[in-house]
């Protein structure tokens, strides 16, 4: 089977990770101790993608939990699914990274990273055919951002041919946890551009908006936000966990979604959106799901795709869905909104179907889009970065851990390059490209 090893780093990563494991344990018929008491063969068939079978019908997540302070781990352990995880797979320090990327990446995190890699190695050795890794973390803090990206590059070194997917919580414009978020995020993006194969961007503000506007929750808790994220993560990984007519795995997803290696930052969405307690029991149809799924209000990253164009997107439908209906709807979306899709990638929507819906729903859909409008997000962080960096504000916290200002300058320019690459492909048309071909062809696509 094609196994995936899951890592969660830092407070945010561990909380999202815990929600994810809770969601998929439920879908696979596991109780909070990992004992199987489900009803369907399909739940068992691909259990091994995310779970190891231990003795006595018990399944253990292939998860590595990492943090630089014990607090969040204790919370996970004391939570409803705390007994699910293998105790040796909790790796934590005592000092904390204090929202400082340099501590996570160079000092505190670097001391712990070998212990984490030992656990990762052990998990990888327990796999038949490892497909890749997924990591949940935030980009604004110290541990998730600094140590998370350190782990990604170390794992990259050791498993160069395996996929690396990240679920990254990006700082949001209105909801800020720390002043130095722009620094941490820029330094992290600098790493992700080089070392990740696919990054699913999630941001708290967009999640807040969904909770307030769509779910009508007056003051959403992080629990509600994490529930939304886990719904998306469950959707993105459906095809890996259940047999379906049109399956995709991490690599297929990347092949279909990433037209140029650096442009692998995706927006995600989910439909139908329901709050944690109230699963609406009204029937949803494929057209409704499609319409909801492509609605900017449903996107979990604060950038509006109407300001850019889709390079590619992927839609994953779950439940009793007619294949033909999905195809028709997708064609429909593309024809009606052709201005939002680049015309130089024909048929740029990939669809996948899975017969098993999430718990409490008849059908659902998950949306993954590679849109040039994601540059808004990087632009926003970049502007905040520049404002502080110009005055060298807060820099001493980073240089004190042995970082060089040069590294900040590099990260800044790498992110600015990323923004202009997105812009370049947004503006590119089929007709204008003819003249540019002479200089560009060898650089972009060296033909075999």
Curated annotation (Swiss-Prot):
Residues bound to Mg(2+): 69
The keyword Calcium is assigned to this record: no
Keywords: Cytoplasm, Cytoskeleton, GTP-binding, Magnesium, Metal-binding, Microtubule, Nucleotide-binding
SUPFAM superfamilies documented for this protein: Tubulin C-terminal domain-like, Tubulin nucleotide-binding domain-like
Stretches of the chain forming a coiled coil according to its record: none
Single Gene Ontology BP annotation: microtubule-based process
Cofactor(s) needed by this chain: Mg(2+)
Chain positions recorded as GTP binding sites: 11, 69, 138, 142-144, 204, 226
Comp. bias regions, Acidic residues: 429-448
Region (Disordered): 425-448
Keyword Nucleotide-binding: yes
Function: Tubulin is the major constituent of microtubules, a cylinder consisting of laterally associated linear protofilaments composed of alpha- and beta-tubulin heterodimers. Microtubules grow by the addition of GTP-tubulin dimers to the microtubule end, where a stabilizing cap forms. Below the cap, tubulin dimers are in GDP-bound state, owing to GTPase activity of alpha-tubulin.
Name of the protein described by the UniProt record: Tubulin beta chain
Species whose genome carries this gene: Metarhizium anisopliae (Entomophthora anisopliae)
């Amino acid at each position: 089977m094609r196994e995936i090893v899951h890592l969660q780093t830092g407070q945010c990563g561990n909380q999202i990770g815990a929600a994810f494991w809770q969601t998929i344990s439920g879908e696979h018929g596991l109780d909070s101790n990992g004992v199987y008491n489900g009803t369907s063969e399909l739940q068992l068939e691909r259990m091994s993608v995310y779970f190891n079978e231990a003795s006595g019908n018990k399944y253990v997540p292939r998860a590595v939990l990492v943090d630089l302070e014990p607090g969040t781990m204790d919370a996970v352990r004391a939570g409803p699914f705390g007994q699910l995880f293998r105790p040796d797979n909790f790796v934590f320090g005592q000092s904390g990274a204090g929202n400082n990327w340099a501590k996570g990446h160079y000092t505190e995190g670097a001391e712990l990273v070998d212990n984490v890699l030992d656990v990762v190695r052990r998990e990888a050795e327990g796999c038949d055919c490892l497909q890749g890794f997924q990591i949940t973390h935030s980009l604004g803090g110290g541990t998730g951002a600094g140590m998370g990206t350190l782990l990604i590059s170390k794992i990259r070194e050791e498993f160069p041919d395996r996929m690396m997917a990240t679920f990254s919580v990006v700082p949001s414009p209105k909801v800020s946890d720390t002043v130095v978020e722009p620094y941490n995020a820029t330094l992290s993006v600098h790493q992700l551009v080089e070392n990740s194969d696919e990054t699913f961007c999630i941001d708290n503000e967009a999640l807040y908006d969904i909770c307030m506007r769509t779910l009508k929750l007056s003051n959403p808790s992080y629990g509600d936000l994490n529930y939304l994220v886990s719904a998306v993560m469950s959707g993105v990984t459906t095809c890996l966990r259940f047999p379906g007519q049109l399956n995709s795995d991490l690599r297929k997803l990347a092949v279909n979604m990433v037209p140029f290696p650096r442009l692998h930052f995706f927006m995600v969405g989910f439909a139908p959106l329901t709050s944690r307690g109230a699963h609406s029991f009204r029937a949803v149809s494929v057209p409704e799901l499609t319409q909801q799924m492509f609605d900017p209000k449903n996107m979990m990253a604060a950038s509006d795709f109407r300001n850019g164009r889709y390079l590619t997107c992927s839609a994953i439908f779950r439940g009793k869905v007619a294949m033909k209906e999905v195809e028709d709807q997708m064609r429909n979306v593309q024809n009606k909104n052709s201005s939002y899709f680049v015309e130089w990638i024909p048929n740029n929507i990939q669809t996948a179907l899975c017969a098993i819906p999430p718990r409490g729903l008849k059908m659902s859909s998950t949306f993954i889009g590679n849109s040039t409008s994601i540059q808004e997000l990087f632009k926003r962080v970049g502007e905040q970065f520049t404002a502080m960096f110009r005055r060298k504000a807060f820099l001493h916290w980073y240089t004190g851990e042995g970082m060089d200002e040069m590294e900040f300058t590099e990260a800044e320019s790498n992110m600015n390059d990323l923004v202009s690459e997105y812009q370049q492909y947004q503006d590119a048309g089929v007709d204008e490209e003819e003249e540019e071909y002479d200089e560009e062809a060898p650089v972009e696509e060296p033909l075999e």
